[in-house]
From Swiss-Prot:
One of its GO terms (biological process) is translation. Residues 20-54 are annotated as: Disordered. Disulfide bonds: none annotated. This is Large ribosomal subunit protein uL15. Signal peptide: none annotated. PROSITE patterns: RIBOSOMAL_L15. InterPro entries: Ribosomal_uL15, Ribosomal_uL15/eL18, Ribosomal_uL15/eL18_sf, Ribosomal_uL15_bac-type, Ribosomal_uL15_CS. Binds to the 23S rRNA. Part of the 50S ribosomal subunit. The keyword Flavoprotein does not apply. The gene is rplO.
Amino acid sequence: MKLNELKYTPGSKTKATIVGRGMASGKGKTATRGHKGQNSRSGGGVRPGFEGGQTPLFRRLPKVGFTSLNQKQYTILNLSDLETLGLEKIDHESLINSKIIKNNASLIKILANGTLTKKVDVKVNKISKAAKDAIEKLGGKVEVI
């Protein structure tokens, strides 16, 4: 096989059918839309979710819950992630440099999944009790900001 011998698979490249350009084309007059009716009209068609008059799914299902306006999204880091990063100091700046978070506005929470084998100094927004104990056990410092 050579680059100059590459060909498209037969049938994969078909020309778009041009409709409404005269009877001789075979796709003139109604231009494949049929006669009359909502879908034959300009701008015709049904709205998304319309089920032909049957009560649509979004109205059959109950309204549940709400989205809190004060919700805070935390970037979750586990002890195993800190081990993988291999940094001595974990804070917003070091995580931005490692491309874990995008900016200082990100909130960070550390959880205790995995194990940690080396000393790490941590400066984060939230930390679980188990993660805090694991870091301090190895001689690291934990600062909640």
